[in-house]
A protein has these predicted regions:
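Conserved, well-ordered alpha-helix/loop/beta-strand core segments that scaffold catalytic motifs
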Residues: 223-261
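N-terminal secretory signal peptides
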Residues: 1-11, 21-27
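Small/polar-residue-rich segments within soluble enzyme cores
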Residues: 97-101, 116-236, 529, 547, ...
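N-terminal export leaders
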Residues: 13-17
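Aromatic-capped interface at the extracytoplasmic side
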Residues: 33-55
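Short, small/polar residue-rich loop motifs at catalytic or cofactor-binding pockets
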Residues: 57-61, 211, 256-260
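Beta-lactam-recognizing serine transpeptidase/beta-lactamase-like catalytic domain environment
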Residues: 2-5, 218-228, 268-319, 324-599, ...
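Short beta->alpha transition motifs characteristic of CBS
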Residues: 60, 76-81, 274-280
Length: 646
């Protein structure tokens, strides 16, 4: 009996301990539940909300690039695309295979996606394919239940309506590379593009705008159910250029078959009205995504379509440099306009012969400075160069803009080369030779200039020696256009012509005598309009009521052999293209009241006469359209926040 009682007491104690433990555990659980559901309810509601709500950045509309009259050179249009979120897929490669059965996915697109998956975080959307048709986009939407991690998206894509004709100016946008990442969250967005070349690159931050955001309700699989709220971003600023698109297009078509460059510039304000480099490329191809094969084709092209020859092509200026040598002689007092030299076609310095281009005709005979320029007598300029020395020639060249960059609103501008005695000694370790001075006097030897520099040189000759500098943007600080974009000459109480006069007043003189400038520019008029000028075949038609002044230039790319000289020089038709001389012509018009400077350089074009023929056609169009006389978008026109149609 006692044993049974002991057992009962032990059992009761165990039950009490077990019951107490259960009660304690229940109390702890109840307390924890109270803590979670009551005391911490707000915190967990917020976390639950965050799991249900997805915040997404919205790319703002990129600013437009417009010409001086408001024509769109870079715009935006609706872009149907597909993005992929790696962590939501059952396997990226498998998902791409399924997607490729619905819409076209090319090997280079697939390879790019697989590369980006490795370098990006798994929750960051990756652009798969863009610019789908509506039918393709609809097919993807129908198949979405079988495509986890795939998201159809509608955004804006960049479009270049003028294509290759303005490519070297406008540039292009392309995908963000790892080197481009700067911490701006916009750069992480799928399919986001940044400027990689031209105006698109130089003004990228201004064109880019500020991001907006969207609060989206999503389900457990991350799919969007609805948009709860949206805050639009700030559209990018528009950039208005000085270019006249109609003129640009006509010049581009005229040079389409050449490896060439042309620049048209207002001589007083420095506005670039046209800048053409041929051959060109389609900037839309870069926006869509260029294949490796297409890229190699462009890079290996013998005529270098990716290079803007107007600012990066460096050529011996040839006889277009003779005006600089003449001015250096006049300013230094070593020769006046009446200084005469007898040209028999060749001179000798030691054992070396220096020829004139008219050597096979017995030379030019007696020529003065005006005739020396008009007839492009090499012997005359050998004589001036010998009297001057290379350093005085170089000093005058630099006053006219050669040997420097201007900071124009483009990438890749080159400085060319104006040599000196010190330069040669520092670079080669060999002293300067007198023969090199003679060759410099006709624009050869080490001299190099870009077409843009030659345009600036010509503008400074024609505008009375004012140090005008080229510019490509009318509103470098961006801004919006108002209304429909039709600009007027007077906006916000400001007169555009008054602005131009103020701009002229700020330009400094290069310090060259007006009388000496007139001697040289009169000679340039005789080049085209004189009876014996080297470009007399290419004077402007009488119905234009204006005359053009200019200077031919033929730049050798290799030395003429004795056999070739004996045969009368190189015959371009019989010479391989790469060995033909470059053809140059620089001009201004109208004579008497100059406004425009034009330069044409044709690689391996044969002779300056060929470039003169092209320049005649271009200057004719310039004077007929007279872009500086027409109302353009004012420098401060418009307002921010302009709405765009896409």
């Amino acid at each position: 009996m006692e044993r049974d009682g002991s057992r009962h007491k032990a059992f009761s104690r165990r039950m009490a301990l077990l019951g107490g433990s259960q009660l304690s555990l229940a109390a702890v659980l109840m307390g924890r539940m109270y803590y979670l559901q009551v005391l911490e309810s707000d915190q967990y509601k917020m976390l639950a909300e965050e799991n249900r709500i997805s915040m997404r950045l919205l790319a703002p509309p990129r600013g437009l690039v417009l010409d001086r009259f408001g024509q769109e050179l870079a715009s935006n249009r609706q872009n149907y695309r597909v993005v992929l979120i790696a962590e939501q897929t059952k396997g990226v490669a498998e998902t791409l295979d399924r997607l490729a059965r619905i819409i076209p996915i090319y090997p280079h697109q697939r390879s790019r996606v697989l590369r980006e998956v490795k370098r990006k975080r798994p929750f960051v959307p990756i652009n798969v394919v863009e610019n789908l048709t509506w039918e393709q986009f609809a097919r993807v939407n129908v198949q979405l239940p079988d495509l986890p991690g795939v998201q159809p998206d509608v955004g804006e894509g960049r479009f270049y309506p003028k294509g290759a004709e303005t490519a070297h100016i406008v540039g292009y946008v392309s995908s963000v590379s790892e080197a481009d990442l700067t911490g701006d969250p916009l750069l992480e967005l799928p399919g986001f593009r940044i400027g990689k070349n031209g105006v698109e690159k130089v003004f990228d931050e201004s064109l880019r705008g500020k991001a907006g955001n969207s609060r989206m309700e999503v389900n457990a699989y991350g799919r969007v159910i609805r948009e709860l709220a949206r805050q639009d971003g700030q559209p990018g600023n528009d950039v208005v250029l000085t270019v006249d698109t109609n003129l640009q297009e006509k010049i581009a078509r005229r040079l389409a078959d050449e490896s060439a460059a042309a620049v048209v510039m207002d001589i007083h304000q420095g506005e670039i009205l046209a800048m053409v480099s041929s051959p060109s490329f389609d900037p839309n191809a870069f926006n869509l995504g260029l294949s490796a094969k297409a890229w190699r084709t462009l890079v290996r092209h013998p005529r270098h379509p990716l290079v803007n020859k107007a600012i990066a092509g460096q050529y011996p200026p040839g006889s277009t440099f003779k005006m600089i040598v003449a001015l250096a002689a006049l300013e230094a007092g070593v020769a006046g306009p009446g200084h005469r030299v007898f040209c028999k076609g060749v001179i000798k310095l030691g054992n070396t012969k220096f020829h004139c281009w008219r050597n096979r005709y017995g030379g030019h005979g007696w020529v003065d400075m005006k005739q020396g320029i008009a007839q492009s007598c090499d012997i005359y300029f050998y004589d001036l160069a010998r009297r001057l020395g290379v350093d005085r020639i170089g000093a005058m060249a630099r006053r006219f803009g050669l040997g420097e960059t201007f900071g124009i609103e483009l990438t890749g501008e080159k400085a060319g080369l104006v040599p000196s005695k010190d330069w040669k000694l520092a670079v080669t370790g060999v002293p300067w030779q007198l023969g090199e001075t003679l060759i410099t006097g006709i624009g050869q030897a080490y001299l190099l200039a870009t077409p843009l520099q030659l345009a600036v040189m010509t503008a400074r000759l024609a505008n009375g020696g004012m140090a005008v500098r080229p510019r490509l943007s009318r509103r470098p600080d961006g801004g919006k256009l108002s209304g429909d974009g039709a600009g007027s000459a007077v906006e916000n109480g400001r007169d555009e012509d008054d602005d131009a006069r103020k701009s002229d007043a700020a330009v400094q003189s290069i310090g060259v005598s007006a009388a000496n400038l007139k001697i040289v520019t009169d000679a340039m008029s005789d080049v085209v309009n004189g009876a014996r000028g080297t470009a007399r075949k290419y004077k402007l038609d009488k119905e234009l009521g204006a005359k053009m002044a200019g200077k031919t230039g033929t730049a050798q790319v290799r030395r003429i052999t004795k056999a070739e000289r004996k045969a009368g020089g190189k015959l371009s038709k019989e010479t391989p293209w790469k060995e033909r001389d470059h053809a140059l012509f620089t001009a201004f018009a109208p004579v008497g009241a100059p406004r425009y400077a034009t330069v044409v350089v044709v690689e391996h074009g044969g002779s300056g006469g060929y470039a003169a023929r092209l320049t005649k056609d271009i200057m004719t169009e310039v004077l007929r359209s007279d872009p500086m006389a027409r109302s353009a978008l004012g420098p401060d026109s418009g307002e921010r926040g302009r709405k765009r149609e896409i």
